[in-house]
Amino acid sequence: LLSVKKELNNFFKNIYVAPGNHDVKLGSTDERKVFLQVFKKNFNSFFFKDNLFFILDTTINPGNITADQLKLIKNELSKKKKLNSIFIITHHVIWENYVKQNVQSAVKKNFFLNNNFGQLKKILLTYKNYKSIIFIAGDVSVTNKTTKLFCEKNENFYYLMTGMGSKNFDNYLKISISEQGKSVSIVPVFF
């Protein structure tokens, strides 16, 4: 992980990582300790041009957002009177059971049965001054059975799934935000 971070530092001033099960496994593990030594935090937030980004950890309590992360979200939302977009970035597709279309992430269907995505969504809905809420997840695995790229809009909520590992339709998302922060463009980059 340290060598990866050093390489990324050549290109980016700030690096925010949503840890996945290949990075830290599930729960409290030795791999998680190494991850925290390298990246210092397992979840974070930042503002960029009146857009608020949350990078969350869904591996410590598998498929869930922990209480300390929910507290961070509430605190950060209370700091701004108006936002253009709110981005929620996770490894696991915690919203898999909340979209209309059928998506297949890398985990079994029952993985998210007891998750607290509804609680997260309720917190976000209490904040009224935003244009859109964009959920991005990347746990599409190395199998060919998973959905490789997905986008669904439901009211002001956007659900995006991206990822790599199978060598078929591997992709990442390029997010561009206008100078004023009001226009957001998200484009898949395939390789």
Task: Pin down the residues of each PLM region.
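Short, solvent-exposed aromatic-acidic interface loops
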Residues: 186-191
